[in-house]
């Protein structure tokens, strides 16, 4: 896999607060190689390491996108949800940004059944089919559709398991990460100083609580995916 230039610079990461970790009492000792200092009771992430692993992740997603691979971006906490949706839509990726339903990947047949139901209900709504039902039945199906939209709206076009999963906040999305590990799906994780860097295929040490930090990391990955997709379109 060829290395490329992704315009990752330390000043930009400093401005976004990528270097701020968790309090020194809330840390995982395995993160020691990725921490450069302690300041006012918090750990400071080594941004040189961040840049290195972010660059490796960009190389990986570019290469995968250039081969037509599918991506899933996961980030369900409030500070990540909007950034995840925007990044995924921009890069034409699937996403989960509300709640991870246990077994979403490991019990794929059940997820697939839910997606079929979701698509059927959307079609019924668009064609006016729901309005022709008795009010009670229509109300029940509309509530069901609303719930499916909330939890499955970001994966409504997913027809198979993703090739790569990008996870914002390893701690928050641990269930999703374990499912990927079980299935052998490669993962890229944004990890803070309280995480285990050995669980993902590529771990990017960074502040997973600041919106600006999350947005910056996702933006770099999105640019790489989009460039890879363009390469795939030009050379299918």
UniProtKB/Swiss-Prot annotation:
PROSITE patterns the UniProt entry points to: RIBOSOMAL_S2_1, RIBOSOMAL_S2_2
Q: NCBIfam families in the record, alphabetically?
A: rpsB_bact
Q: Which family does it belong to?
A: Belongs to the universal ribosomal protein uS2 family.
Q: Report the GO terms under cellular component.
A: chloroplast; mitochondrial small ribosomal subunit
Keyword Cytoplasm appears in the UniProt entry: no
Compartmental location: Plastid, Chloroplast
One GO MF annotation is: structural constituent of ribosome
Q: Which domain of life is it from?
A: Eukaryota
Primary localisation category: plastid
Write the protein's name.
Answer: Small ribosomal subunit protein uS2c
Give a Pfam family name.
Ribosomal_S2
Q: Which CDD domains match?
A: RPS2
Arranged from A to Z, the UniProt key words for this protein are: Chloroplast, Plastid, Ribonucleoprotein, Ribosomal protein
């Amino acid at each position: 896999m060829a290395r490329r230039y992704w315009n990752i610079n330390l000043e930009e990461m400093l401005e976004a607060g990528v270097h701020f970790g968790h309090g020194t009492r809330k840390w995982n000792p395995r993160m020691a190689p990725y921490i450069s200092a302690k300041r006012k009771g918090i750990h400071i992430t080594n941004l040189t390491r961040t840049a290195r692993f972010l660059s490796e992740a960009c190389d990986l997603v570019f290469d995968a996108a250039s081969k037509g691979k599918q991506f899933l971006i996961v980030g369900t906490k409030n500070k990540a949800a909007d950034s995840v949706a925007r990044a995924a839509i921009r890069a034409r990726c699937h996403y989960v940004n509300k709640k991870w339903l246990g077994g979403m990947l490991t019990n794929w047949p059940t997820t697939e059944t839910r997606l079929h139901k979701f698509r059927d209900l959307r079609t019924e709504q668009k064609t006016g089919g729901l309005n022709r039902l008795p009010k009670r039945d229509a109300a029940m199906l509309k509530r069901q559709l609303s719930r499916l939209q909330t939890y499955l709206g970001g994966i409504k076009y997913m027809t198979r398991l993703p090739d790569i999963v990008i996870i914002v906040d390893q701690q928050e999305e641990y269930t999703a990460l374990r499912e990927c590990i079980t299935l052998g799906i490669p993962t890229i994780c944004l990890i803070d100083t309280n995480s285990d860097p050995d669980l993902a295929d590529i771990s990017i040490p960074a502040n997973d609580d600041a919106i600006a930090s999350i947005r910056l990391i996702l933006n770099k990955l999105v640019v790489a995916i989009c460039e890879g997709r363009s390469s795939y379109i030009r050379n299918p």
